[in-house]
């Protein structure tokens, strides 16, 4: 008896396409049901009668036991949308003077924790790390980032326009303003403290961020934007508290969660940094002793919680970090990032154009003559910050002294940026 060949059914291409789309949709729905929540998470800050001991030991401090931690981190890599492989608890409290953050990064293999560097503002992507994004104006564009690692590294910077044009947070290339008025300014350094500790549970850290170091609206009970990032280096894992798609990073301020529960006092930041230099020369052909002296002062004052005045007289930048060596092999100018503290406050307000290509204002040209020699700055002032909810302002006035062939110069820069709804 002869057996017949089985019949092969040929489905039309449109039917196959529909089946594939339906299968993808059902799979996506099933995946989403076990993935991150659709709504951004909310954390509540707890008012503290006293500050915890800043030693990095969060679990052993009774102050943190009264605080409900924020938890629930979600991966962007290696498994996008999956829960983080390790538990992370973040405790948030505040006093009249400072915002306090304690984090416990649990790890099933504490011996596998990787620490690559402990220098300030070093690359956090090369080891285990934890970062905090704070959007004090809740504008979804600008914010502050504070980070650390198991060695207690201090990492801080300002995000402008969601870091447009810059690399990811924690990296080594985010040390300059980039993008058209946006970027990440890693050279911005403020006053804050952090301590870390490694234990059998993993590692933990405590941050103390004075309110005077932040800029925020004068609301008594504000709601701030908030997000956290944890890196587990040996697993190549990056996880966020407020989940993000793979193509975004911590600079995506618009997708941050919320921080509630703050009851802030009205504070004014006033800082005066004077300096004095003296020089005595004697001997050689001199009949006596030649004496010379230099006096100067830097002042920072918060006109409002969101508007800052910086003033300087006989400016001295001797303590500023030295630029990295660059070799120029073509006819184009070299661009060095601005590291002078006077120019770093709200530097993004003055940034217009594409860095290293078309920039309307480049602050490093102030204090340098046409032939490349240093030209002393006699003094100056700048006002920068925010007026109202949608207006950013910046005004700068600087004067340089006459030296040799370089004449005295005055520089004035003003910018008003109105954000449309």
Protein language model features and the residues they cover:
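N-terminal secretory signal peptides that target proteins for export/translocation
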Residues: 1-12
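Bacterial N-terminal signal peptides
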Residues: 12-29
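Structural preference for beta-rich elements and adjacent junctions enriched in aromatics
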Residues: 31-419
């Amino acid at each position: 008896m002869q057996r017949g060949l089985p019949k092969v059914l040929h489905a039309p291409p449109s039917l196959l396409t529909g089946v594939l789309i339906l299968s993808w949709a059902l799979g996506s729905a099933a995946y989403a049901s076990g993935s991150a929540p659709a709504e951004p998470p909310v954390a509540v800050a707890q008012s503290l009668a006293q500050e915890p001991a800043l030693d990095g030991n969060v679990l052993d401090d009774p102050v943190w036991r009264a605080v409900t931690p924020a938890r629930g981190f979600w991966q962007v890599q290696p498994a996008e949308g999956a829960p983080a492989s390790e538990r992370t608890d973040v405790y948030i409290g505040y006093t009249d003077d400072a915002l306090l953050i304690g984090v416990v990064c649990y790890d099933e293999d504490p011996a596998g924790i990787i620490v690559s560097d402990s220098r300030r503002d070093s690359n956090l992507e090369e080891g285990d790390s934890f970062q905090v994004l704070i959007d004090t104006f809740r504008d979804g564009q600008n914010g502050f980032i504070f980070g650390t690692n198991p060695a207690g590294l201090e990492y801080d910077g300002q995000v402008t326009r969601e870091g447009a044009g810059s690399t990811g947070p924690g990296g080594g290339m985010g040390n300059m303003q980039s993008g058209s008025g946006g970027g990440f300014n890693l050279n911005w350094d403020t006053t804050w403290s952090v301590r870390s500790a490694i234990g059998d549970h993993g590692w933990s850290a405590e941050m103390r961020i004075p309110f005077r170091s932040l800029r925020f609206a004068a609301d008594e009970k504000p709601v701030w934007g908030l997000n956290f990032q944890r890196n587990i280096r040996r697993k190549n894992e990056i996880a966020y508290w407020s989940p993000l798609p793979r193509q975004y990073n911590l600079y995506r301020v618009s997708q941050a969660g919320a921080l509630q529960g703050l009851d802030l006092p009205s504070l004014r930041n006033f800082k005066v940094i004077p300096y004095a230099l003296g020089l005595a020369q004697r001997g050689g052909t001199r009949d006596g002793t030649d004496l010379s002296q230099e006096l100067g002062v830097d002042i920072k004052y918060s006109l409002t919680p969101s508007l800052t005045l910086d003033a300087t007289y006989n400016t001295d930048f001797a303590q500023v970090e030295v630029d990295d060596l660059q070799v120029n092999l073509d006819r184009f100018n070299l661009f060095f990032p601005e590291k002078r503290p006077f120019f770093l406050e709200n530097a993004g307000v003055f940034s217009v154009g594409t860095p290293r290509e078309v920039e309307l204002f480049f602050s490093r040209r102030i204090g340098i003559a046409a032939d490349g020699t240093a030209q002393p700055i006699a003094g100056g002032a700048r006002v920068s910050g925010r007026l109202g909810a949608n207006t950013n302002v910046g005004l700068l006035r600087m004067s340089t002294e006459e030296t040799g062939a370089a004449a005295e110069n005055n520089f004035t820069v003003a910018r008003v940026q109105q954000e449309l709804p």
